[in-house]
Amino acid sequence: MYFARRVMDVVIGMGASIVSDYPDQFDCPGHLAPLADYHLLSAAVESAKELGTPVRVGNILSEDAFYTDRPNSKDCFRKMGVLAVEMESGALYLNAARAGKRALCILTVSDQQFIRINSN
């Protein structure tokens, strides 16, 4: 994941942009916005405040291919304020919506894909 500032940052996905054909199975005309359940989201933010744990809340990118051959493929999402990239949240939110259930994706940043590390 990246776009958040540091490894170990906690990101709560309010919504999930999707680069995948996964949503097509639901046969919705247009593009459904996969969103977290508001009550779960607000409870998680309140719990983080009580624990003194800083969190960032916002849009995340759910993509089939975490690593690609296109080095600039995520630039648009970064410019649009996407906080992190992962592979499951979009499907989680869509499946929950279809099943009439509630869902929330809480992420911990595990790496920063675009930071170069000097090998010397």
What are these regions (language model features)?
Residues 1-120:
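Glycine-rich phosphate- or other oxyanion-binding loops that anchor nucleotides, phosphorylated ligands
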